Amino acid sequence: MDIERVNDTTIKFFITYKDIEDRGFDRDEIWYNRERGEELFFEMMNEANDRDEFELDGPLWIQVHALDKGLEIVVTRGQVSDGNVKLEIPVSQDKENTDENIVDLMTGHSSEDDEGIDTDQLEIVIGFNDFEDIISLSHNFFIDDLENELYHFEGRYYLHVLFNDDQYNEDEQDDMLSQMLEYGYETDLSIHRMQEYGKEIIGEYALKHLRGHFPQN
């Protein structure tokens, strides 16, 4: 990882995806798993403090650029005076692109990921220890208009489920989720990771199709 001290309040990192993986992180989970994203960020900031005595205190302005070979991250520390925060932010030559890439790394995703996503909708990826567990679920869960897709990833099966708030209230969603988790387990995997690295087995209404093709033992 390269660390460049821009000025007294700003520091720039460049970390390759290989370096991220060598540190024990997955290049996708840092965006979609808040806890892991925070862990990587604080690890980088601790290294910056050790090398350049850049202390992590006060409000931070974080700018992230996802490049072909890694991430470029610019961190500017705000100066608090009389209750007011002053930020001396370096001006990028590509102002428009910079504005679009201003993200809060702690949220675990970029601002671009929010476009077109209804944040009120509950979605989850459920993992299964055995394929038979999914078959059993399909024969005991009969809400066929619930959006769900089946994926295979790293030797296991996963069901992505999307709840429509227009169809089901919060209590109904919780009840359905509880039923499904009797046969599987909740994961922190994202649908984006499933789509990119996994294999789609059934693209829509997976449980309904499984029930029709596989008899229950």
UniProtKB/Swiss-Prot annotation:
Q: Matching InterPro entries, A to Z?
A: MecA_C_sf (IPR038471), Neg-reg_MecA (IPR008681)
Cystine crosslinks: none
Keyword entries, A-Z: Competence, Sporulation
Keyword presence, Signal: no
A GO molecular function term, named singly, is: protein-macromolecule adaptor activity
Name any Gene Ontology BP term: negative regulation of establishment of competence for transformation
Output the superkingdom of the source species: Bacteria
List the NCBIfam families. Answer: PRK02315.1-5 (NF002644)
Q: What is known of its domains?
A: The N-terminal domain has binding sites for ComK and probably for unfolded/aggregated proteins; the C-terminal domain interacts with ClpC.
Q: Function, please? A: Enables the recognition and targeting of unfolded and aggregated proteins to the ClpC protease or to other proteins involved in proteolysis. Acts negatively in the development of competence by binding ComK and recruiting it to the ClpCP protease. When overexpressed, inhibits sporulation. Also involved in Spx degradation by ClpC.
Name the PANTHER family on file: ADAPTER PROTEIN MECA, ADAPTER PROTEIN MECA 1
Describe the protein's quaternary organization and the partners it interacts with.
Homodimer.
Give the family per the record. Belongs to the MecA family.
Protein name, per record? Adapter protein MecA
